[in-house]
Amino acid sequence: MMSCSKEYIDRAEQVILHTYNRFQIVLEKGQGVRLYDVEGKEYLDFAAGIAVFALGYNNPKYSQALKDQIDKVIHTSNLYYNIPMIEAAEKLVKASGLSKVFFTNSGTEAIEGAIKVARKYAYLKDGCTDHEIIAMEHSFHGRSLGALSVTGNTHYQEPFKPLIGGVKFAKFNDLESVKAQITDKTCGIIMETVQGEGGIYPADPEFIKGVRKLCDENDILLILDEIQCGMGRTGDMFACQGYGVMPDVMTCAKALGCGVPVGAFVLNEKTANASLVPGDHGTTYGGNPFACAAVSKVFDLFEEEKIVEHVRQITPYLEEKLDALVEKYDFITIRRGKGLMQGLVLEGKPVGEVVTKAIENGLLVISAGSNVLRLVPPLVITEADIDEMIEKLEKSF
């Protein structure tokens, strides 16, 4: 007799474009830090939809806010103002310390907007159209053409060339490498504050502060991608705040909506006053009342439930348990990360096999790069959840 999961998977393969090698489970519902498949099997989730579900699944106050907004209005377009967009922007500006917001539908759209901001800022200064952006090797910013162009991984890029021009790559955490790429054409430097897909590499403090200084000295815009590492994940609302570094442009998404598709790029006052104007950029769905009601409630719940404080409190316990695994197993060579964005580097044991075995054992974890086991759980995890994760993970080695 065919299982329920197998039936759904077979149907999916008939109609859904094969752009993912999906694991062979069909998830149906979630509660707290757990997901359940159509067979009723429970999974402890340390992936959080790839760092999306900061508040966990089915938070009643979050769900109610969405239901309430559905009963009012979901979409109006950017031809008009709407209250949820205003409130969400106010909260994002306050949390980030920046000045103006443009809401998008995703992280990759936010990156596209940030690239346009940098180019327009430089164009207004000198009237030239041959400006350059410096990006980082092993970075990941998205798969649309502009975002792909600043992604430092030829594997993703090669089939889609030619990409947009004027992009140069420097080594992450190597300030001299960045300096060597700067010319009078450089309009922006884009980097993740913590590299995610590249293998969970936090920026060195000296590096990110040095890049900020280079940008100030050369009137170059610093674009920080906080799509994965932002929204409390590292123990600060945004990871750059832990370094005492403010970007000119910041991109965010993922946990910004905690499941509702939404992204944003946020500008400081200098950049907002000297870049995009009406007609330069637009979106049909970006800033819609439904998505912005989600964003607004996320910020409310972060404050009400003291999410950032909890991340700071729980992080040492997670790091202690992961460091113990490094000591115990020869094939785990190092732990990297900040807050609840952690990676274990595996040597001689394929990370994909561990991820698959973990699923069998009721644990959801994911990979980063070629050999890193990535842990990006909901930010509401407890010590008991961490203990259970360690137990299930060890069974998966």
Predicted regions and their residues:
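Conserved N-terminal phosphate-binding loop of PLP-dependent enzymes in the Aspartate aminotransferase
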Residues: 2-397
